[in-house]
């Protein structure tokens, strides 16, 4: 949560330049890896094209990790079934809304309901992955161990 709030506290120009640098690294890495031999103008063009997408993927990734870090402990402490996505989703989406509200006080930034929706995609995927892998672990690891202990 601290990391997300720290990114949100950055002024718009700082945040934009950081994500632009990441976009530039991606384009230059692709240029080198695939030996495309793009000119500097082409690198700038492709960097501009993916910049918005990189920003939105960063949103999804941040909230994906938040959802995992919230829903996994809830699962371990017995919150399962429909209650896990409801509780973890409420906490994470609520935090996303507060984060967008927080951005309204930062220079060059503003709140966006659309960003909360994009954040919710990462939240949804993170919660589903926790449910899937924890259920899989219970079926494949812990259930056979429980049967083994009963025989002893």
Regions found by a protein language model. Give the residues of each.
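"…centered on the first transmembrane helix and the immediately adjacent amphipathic helix/loop
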Residues: 1-61
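Small-polar-interrupted transmembrane alpha-helices in polytopic inner-membrane proteins
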Residues: 1-2, 84-103
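Alpha-helical membrane-protein architecture signal
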Residues: 46, 50, 87-90, 114-117
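Membrane-interface loop-to-helix entry segments
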Residues: 52-66, 113-121
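Membrane-interfacial alpha-helical segments at the cytosolic side of multi-pass membrane proteins
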Residues: 62-76, 121-137
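Membrane-helix interface segments
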Residues: 77-87, 109-113
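Interfacial helix-loop-helix junctions of multi-pass membrane proteins
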Residues: 96-120
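Membrane-interfacial, low-structure loops and terminal tails that flank and connect transmembrane helices
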Residues: 140-152
């Amino acid at each position: 949560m601290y990391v997300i709030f720290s990114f949100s506290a950055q002024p718009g120009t700082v945040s934009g330049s950081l994500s632009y640098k990441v976009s530039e690294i991606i384009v230059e890495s692709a240029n080198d890896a695939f030996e495309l031999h793009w000119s500097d103008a082409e690198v700038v063009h492709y960097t501009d094209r993916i910049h918005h997408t990189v920003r939105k993927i960063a949103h999804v990734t941040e909230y994906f990790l938040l959802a995992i870090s919230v829903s996994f402990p809830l699962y371990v402490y017995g919150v399962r079934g429909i209650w896990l996505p409801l509780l973890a989703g409420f906490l994470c989406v609520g935090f996303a809304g507060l984060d967008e509200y927080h951005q309204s006080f930062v220079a060059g930034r503003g709140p966006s309901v659309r960003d909360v929706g994009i954040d919710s995609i990462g939240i949804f995927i993170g919660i589903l992955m926790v449910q899937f892998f924890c259920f899989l672990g219970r079926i494949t690891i812990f259930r056979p161990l429980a049967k083994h202990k009963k025989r002893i």
